[in-house]
From Swiss-Prot:
It comes from the Eukaryota. It comes from Equisetum arvense (Field horsetail). Its main location: plastid. The lineage of its organism: Eukaryota, Viridiplantae, Streptophyta, Embryophyta, Tracheophyta. This is Ferredoxin-2. Residues 2-91 form the 2Fe-2S ferredoxin-type domain. Pfam families: Fer2 (PF00111). Gene3D superfamilies: 3.10.20.30. Keywords: 2Fe-2S, Chloroplast, Electron transport, Iron, Iron-sulfur, Metal-binding, Plastid, Transport. Belongs to the 2Fe2S plant-type ferredoxin family. Ferredoxins are iron-sulfur proteins that transfer electrons in a wide variety of metabolic reactions.
Length: 93
């Protein structure tokens, strides 16, 4: 399993995600995360990767430049390593 740490306005939340599992499937039970479409087509769930890698290829909202800057759509992100993500970043776009 990969260790996921979400840095939320309410503090850090850490949990394990199995390979191939979307972090939101566990994360939404652990934290009050902003969600809307849950399909990677909007920016409600936007976060920023501090460390680690995720697969967010299902998403359509972010362009390559935003992804290179570390932005991530947490609703579709599948961790590919231990990962630390700052949540609640929609206002930055």
């Amino acid at each position: 399993a990969y260790k996921v740490t979400l840095k939320t306005p309410d503090g850090d939340i850490t949990f394990d995600v199995e390979p191939g599992e979307r972090l939101i499937d566990i994360g939404s039970e652990k934290a009050d995360l902003p969600l809307s479409c849950q399909a990677g087509a909007c920016s409600t769930c936007l976060g920023k990767i501090v460390s680690g890698t995720v697969d967010q290829s299902e998403g359509s909202f972010l362009d390559d430049e935003q992804i290179e800057q570390g932005y991530v759509l947490t609703c579709i992100a599948i961790p590919e390593s231990d990962v630390v993500i700052e949540t609640h970043k929609e206002d930055e776009l």
